[in-house]
Amino acid sequence: MAQAHKESVLAAACVRTPVNPYTKAPLALYERELGERQQQRTASVSPQRLPRTSMGTPAAPAAALDWEEARCCKSRRCQDWVFDISKVHHPDKDYYVQVEKLKKAHLQNMEQLEKMYDKKLHLSGVHNPENEQGVVREVYRSAWEPKSVLPAEYDDKYLKHSLSGSVSPSLSESSHESTNGDSSDSEHSVSARNKILDMWNEFTVEDYIRNSEYFSKEIAKNKTSKKSKEWSHKITIPEPFQMTIRESKKKEMNIKSKSEIELENNLLKKKLEEEAECQKKFRANPVPSSVYLPLYQEIVERNEERRSFVKEKSKDILLATQKPFQFIEREERKKTLRLDFMNLSTSVPSANHFKAKPVPKSIYGTSTAERLKEEELYRGIRIHMRAQELLQNSSYPTITLAPGAHSGTKKGKCYKPKEKQKHKPKISATIPHSQTMHENQQKRLPESTSTKHVTVCEPFQLRTSNIPSHKEKIIMDIQADEENLKETRWPYKSPRAQARIHSSAGTLNPQGEALCNIPRSTELSKRREHAIRKREKQRTKDYMKELEAMEQRVLNKPLLIERVAQRNALMSAEKQYLNVLRDLGLSEEFVSKNGQSASVDEHVSVREENNPRAESTEGTLVLEDLLDDAEKYQTDPESEEAQEEDAYSTDEDHSMEEI
């Protein structure tokens, strides 16, 4: 198969189709035949072709000969600079020529189809109204046909040029006239200018004035010359198509087509085959023994063995190719050196000498309380200095300098209950003198501008006294709440209090609503607030006293260095005393019997049992001694919490005391 395909491809590659010499495109068979016919026609055309006049009629022979001689002379003069335009490739021209040919062929086909349709209608006996207008259609036929932009003769020339590949008609005419001369010289003797002149010589105006007034008049004359038939009233009766009639007849006669018959035969064959298959008897083969073999388990075990073998093999390969990192070796060397150093340090006993830390600088400085007092004093001095500077640089407010500002303070914008004025304004009967008032104002003006008044703060006028209140009822409610409900006393809302219904709720403004929501200050609430403030002040005083006492205890307490030195001195004295007793040969029992320094002996014996290396310390302080000392001076945290609870109390305790 592959060899046959290769041979066919090779044969197809060897075959070369003919190519158009102008477009270099492959030519089809019908195009080649048309080209050959066109060449034969051009060869058979006589060389004595006469030119046409401007009106389309053939010219006289003498005039034609003179015209041909003049054109030959012109062509001989221009032989040196002539450029053969026939040899230039014009693909657009060939394309448009082919399009015109196709249009003409299409029109011819449509005419043939129309004639065939008319014949069929005539045979079937159907009246064709178009036959009556056949004459008119023939008149307008020339107008319907599409014309090219160029004249008819010019199109024919270029059509011959495109099909046969020969020279233009003008060039062929000159070549036929000079038959005795050389063919090669005649082909190159025509120039572009001569070709353009040939076009204008063969130009006719009739090709471009088909739609003119003259042409329309001729068509009108032809119409009037023919007799017009009278109009006859007829009704169009629709008739069915022949194919519908034929199909209906077939259905009535129950005639089946060949394809339907074949389809029925195939269906019958299939049914018979299926019935034959269903009637056959069969017996199933026994189940093969290979089905019962545990093949899956064997495959799984084999895979597991292979996986474990590959794992071990890869591990061995990795261990064989593994190389330790440099930092691992370095760390191992460090570990060995560290262990050696530890062994040396344990073998050689070293004397641990106590080295005290330097005394902090805060001990020699002033105490924190004194520093705080100094900072407070400096802060007060700075505040006082700043207040004096602001007082000197301050100016009197510009609002107070306005007319009427010195008469009184500005009235606050607050809600006032509408009350009727009991007094009437006094109207002065005297008219003030404007000139004197102006002079007095001019005198007071420099004084007010030179002096800088200090802003005076006045107390707020909240107008709470103007609000009506039921003091007795409020006091009774508060007392009842304190006796029965501790959690619902003032300032919390009492459940027994009746909701006040405002009759003028819709007419109140936002300021009045805000004032109604403000809790009212009573004498009892003022007394309670005063007592709370007093207790807070007492608590702060007690707290400050306790802080001072704590600071005093810390200052009076000896320093850790002093305590360590005292303890070391005591221990060295006790040790020296024991050494003296040992040198004298006295035992501890003798000392205990006599009751001398019994407590000291017990302390020393316990310390020797716990620390056998105490002899090498030479009377220095050990970490255990510091811990014991810290335990002595350490206070119990629970006792401190109890003391703090006794010293400070919460608001709940005060509330319980009030109850």
From Swiss-Prot:
Residues 637-650 have a biased composition (Acidic residues). GO terms for biological process: cell projection organization. Its main location: cytoplasm. Residues 600-616 have a biased composition (Basic and acidic residues). InterPro entries: FAM161 (IPR051655), FAM161A/B (IPR019579). Residues 96-120, 531-557 form a coiled coil. It holds the Pfam family FAM161A_B. Residues 408-426 have a biased composition (Basic residues). GO terms for cellular component: centriole; cilium; cytoplasm. The keyword Coiled coil applies. Residues 34-59, 165-190, 401-428, 594-659 are annotated as: Disordered. Keywords: Cell projection, Cilium, Cilium biogenesis/degradation, Coiled coil, Cytoplasm, Cytoskeleton. It is found in: Cytoplasm, Cytoskeleton, Cilium basal body; Cell projection, Cilium; Cytoplasm, Cytoskeleton, Microtubule organizing center, Centrosome, Centriole. Involved in ciliogenesis. Belongs to the FAM161 family. PANTHER family: PROTEIN FAM-161, PROTEIN FAM161A. This is Protein FAM161A. It comes from Xenopus tropicalis (Western clawed frog).
